[in-house]
């Protein structure tokens, strides 16, 4: 049965959308008016490399069995949807029209699957060790999440690396690392049934007889998506330096021993919260994947471009580590550098200052 899925965020969201469309489900992308008009006219293109193929293939939404449309936040009719995907960067949810839509989503009690790096606050409330911690400081505006029931919000580890090529239109996405979305289960079994249905449908898709990478994998453990934290703190946030941004590869491989110590420390924090070592990704596997990540992280690129706010998983992990009594000088240093770079932009003239 075709499901109808609403995804907030048309850039990274178009990757999950394409996988759902290939499996015969219908998707609405929520974005700016100009981008919505472009997508409604031309569809989306996601470039992905299949196993054993040398070049990326363009997968066009208009050629897929599911139907795609795009709309602005104000025009969403929530009664049409079975599931909401959260694919915007965390600071974007503070936009007024998005906030209004988020209030409606919370009131409609629709299950929400996040593919953000920054875990939604209600998701963290599902983890007993975090439920009473003071973590609001890490969010641009924590009030956005106040109305959501924790059991209705789950998180995917957004491992696939993808970016919008700067020379292309806003409906094109290039997938650099086609790994899987690893989702934790919802609290409600009916919602998990839907999630596992989508997992199976995506898994069954082939293209010219070839398997298509980037699957949706569902896990019972709430801690599987937290494996991403070790990667973000070791690579993505350390792309932000006091000077120019560096690539993820250089951040990780510049001092492999230091990188492993940071990675292991964050893994240790997740285990203190209740994660099983099986929920985690070995450092060696991550370091190998990082060899092919030749660009700075999206966070580093955003800071370099003058963004006044970015997702702050670095600060979130710092707050948790201090409240657990397990701080790390290296993590604290990373947070300090990110704060310093963001403050430079604000002092230089706020949003958009170069």
PLM feature spans:
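Rossmann-fold NAD(P) dinucleotide-binding segment
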Residues: 75-120
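Rossmann-fold dinucleotide-binding core
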Residues: 79, 113-230, 234-235
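Anion (oxyanion) recognition and catalysis
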Residues: 21-22, 106, 271
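Conserved N-terminal Rossmann-fold NAD(P) cofactor-binding segment
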Residues: 31-81, 102
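NAD(P)+-binding Rossmann beta1-loop-alpha1 motif at the extreme N-terminus of oxidoreductases
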Residues: 1-50, 121-122, 354
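C-terminal substrate-binding/catalytic lobe of Rossmann-fold NAD(P)-dependent dehydrogenases
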Residues: 179-302
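Conserved active-site and cofactor/substrate-binding residues in soluble primary-metabolism enzymes
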Residues: 34, 96, 189, 193, ...
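C-terminal active-site/capping subdomain that shapes the small-molecule cofactor and substrate pocket
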Residues: 267-354
